[in-house]
Curated annotation (Swiss-Prot):
Family matches, as InterPro entries: Ribosomal_Su5_D2-typ_SF, Ribosomal_uS5, Ribosomal_uS5_bac-type, Ribosomal_uS5_C, Ribosomal_uS5_N, Ribosomal_uS5_N_CS, Ribsml_uS5_D2-typ_fold_subgr
Acyltransferase keyword on record: no
HAMAP family documented for this protein: Ribosomal_uS5_B
Function as written in the Swiss-Prot or TrEMBL entry: With S4 and S12 plays an important role in translational accuracy. Located at the back of the 30S subunit body where it stabilizes the conformation of the head with respect to the body.
Organism: Methylococcus capsulatus (strain ATCC 33009 / NCIMB 11132 / Bath)
Protein's GO biological process: translation
Record text on subunit structure and interactions: Part of the 30S ribosomal subunit. Contacts proteins S4 and S8.
Swiss-Prot/TrEMBL domain comment: The N-terminal domain interacts with the head of the 30S subunit; the C-terminal domain interacts with the body and contacts protein S4. The interaction surface between S4 and S5 is involved in control of translational fidelity.
Protein name: Small ribosomal subunit protein uS5
Family that this chain belongs to: Belongs to the universal ribosomal protein uS5 family.
Length: 169
C-alpha cells in the first residue's frame, strides 16, 4: 500500500516522503497485538538521501520514528546535474533495480518506491526498472545502494591516475 505524502518544512530544508505503512501483528497468549510499520525516505534534493523503517503501536508514532531514523542514516550520492553519471544495477533481497541516466525533459520513469527516492534525492531525469519483488522495503534499499555506488568521472580519473578528458575519450 504505497501511500505517498510530502511534509514541507521538515528540519534543515529536507524533503520527507512516506513510502509505505503496514499493519503487523504479534501473537501472544491473550490474542493478537497489532502495530504498524512505517517506511520513509528523506533527502535534501541535492544529492543526500536516507531511509528509515520503524514500528510502533500507533501510525503517527511509527512515522515519526521512521523519519528520525532516516535523517540519521543519510548518505551522499554523486549526481550529474539532475540525472545519474552512468547506468547502475543493485540488488537487495529479491529486489533488483536497474537505473540509467536520461536526457533533460525525460522525467522520472520509475515506479512506486523508487520514484519517492529519486524525488527526495534530487534526480529529475532517470529511467529505472525494478525486477523481481516489488516489496517497497527491499526496493528502497536496492535503489539507495545503487545510488551510493555511483562514481563521478573526476573521482574515477583521479583513482586511475588519468585526466577526465583521457577517461571520457
Amino acid at each position: 500500500m504505497a501511500n505517498v505524502n510530502i511534509q514541507a518544512g521538515a528540519g534543515e530544508g529536507l524533503q520527507e516522503k512516506l513510502v509505505a505503512v503496514r499493519r503487523v501483528s504479534k501473537v501472544v497468549k491473550g490474542g493478537r497485538q497489532f502495530g504498524f510499520t512505517a517506511l520513509t525516505v528523506v533527502g535534501d534534493g541535492n544529492g543526500r538521501v536516507g531511509f528509515g523503517l520503524s514500528k510502533a503501536r500507533e501510525v503517527p508514532v511509527a512515522i515519526q520514528k521512521s523519519m528520525e531514523q532516516a535523517r540519521k542514516n543519510m548518505r551522499k550520492v554523486a549526481l550529474n546535474g539532475q540525472t545519474l553519471h552512468h547506468p547502475v544495477t543493485a540488488a537487495a533481497g529479491a529486489a533488483k533495480v536497474h537505473m540509467q541516466p536520461a536526457s533533460e525533459g525525460t522525467g522520472i520513469i520509475a515506479g512506486g518506491a523508487m520514484r519517492a527516492v529519486f524525488e527526495v534525492v534530487g534526480v529529475h531525469n532517470v529511467l529505472a526498472k525494478c525486477i523481481g519483488t516489488n516489496n517497497p522495503i527491499n526496493v528502497v534499499r536496492a535503489t539507495i545502494k545503487g545510488l551510493t555506488a555511483l562514481r563521478d568521472p573526476k573521482s574515477v580519473a583521479a583513482k586511475r591516475g588519468m585526466t577526465v578528458e583521457e577517461l571520457l575519450g
